[in-house]
Regions:
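Acidic, low-complexity intrinsically disordered tails
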Residues: 183-184
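Polybasic (Lys/Arg-rich)
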Residues: 124, 137-172
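Mg2+/Mn2+-dependent nuclease catalytic core
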Residues: 56-145
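Cys/His-rich metal-chelating microdomains
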Residues: 173-176, 180
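Generic, well-ordered alpha-helical scaffold segments in large soluble proteins
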Residues: 11, 26-33, 108, 112, ...
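A non-catalytic, helix-rich entry segment at domain boundaries
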Residues: 1-50, 54
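Surface-exposed helix-capping loop/turn segments at secondary-structure junctions
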Residues: 1-4, 14-15, 37-38, 111-117, ...
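Short beta-strand or tight-loop elements
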Residues: 43-49, 60-64, 163
Length: 184
């Protein structure tokens, strides 16, 4: 894996040597993983594939990190995660933090014509510990219902920003949200 150091510094001016070493480790681990080997053998893989669909009157847009549709209509979606897992398992993290994303990705693939889809999370911290959630066109109604339920509080105006450590670096702090001034 090679990179243009000048371009790297331009894109990531605050990256430390530790950041660079972590990224290099993750890329190297991914390149040697079973999933990467599988993907290398597929024809017609698309990266950063945009999608858009509506649930009721709400437009949902996103991008698949990696998408492949087989001749049989089955789809593979791979989402790369750079989370530091620590003691957590990838499965625990997907259950706790990515349930809405799973449903949205599955809906996007199925509404886009796939007959079935494997939503696959590749945690680059442990690239061979993938998490796969599988769906078929028979799951469309339950997936839509789940996305509707997720959107309901937002559509009803019942949501607050969640302050976190990223707020300290936000250029829009106190302009778009109250950030750390909100009660926890």
């Amino acid at each position: 894996l090679e990179r243009d150091d000048e371009r790297w510094r331009e894109l990531y001016p605050h990256a430390t040597a530790e950041d660079e070493a972590r990224i290099a480790r993750m890329l190297s681990s991914w390149a040697g993983s079973q999933l990467a080997e599988r993907v290398r053998g597929l024809q017609g893989v698309t990266v950063e594939l945009p999608f858009a669909f509506a649930v009721d009157d709400v437009l949902i847009r996103g991008r698949f990190d990696l998408y492949h549709r087989g001749a049989d209509g089955s789809a593979l979606v791979v989402d790369y995660k750079t989370n530091v897992l620590g003691d957590r398992t990838p499965d625990e993290l997907v259950e706790r933090s990515y349930g809405h994303q799973v449903a949205i990705y599955a809906l996007a693939a199925l509404l886009g014509g796939a007959t079935s889809v494997d939503i696959t999370y590749a945690f680059l911290d442990r690239p061979d510990a993938v998490v796969v959630r599988s769906f078929t066109s028979g799951d469309l109604d339950s997936l839509r219902d789940g996305v509707r339920a997720s959107m309901a509080p937002i559509l009803e105006g019942r949501f607050l920003p969640r302050p976190g450590p990223w707020c300290n670096e936000c250029p829009a702090l106190d302009l778009l949200c109250a950030g750390p001034a909100l009660p926890s």
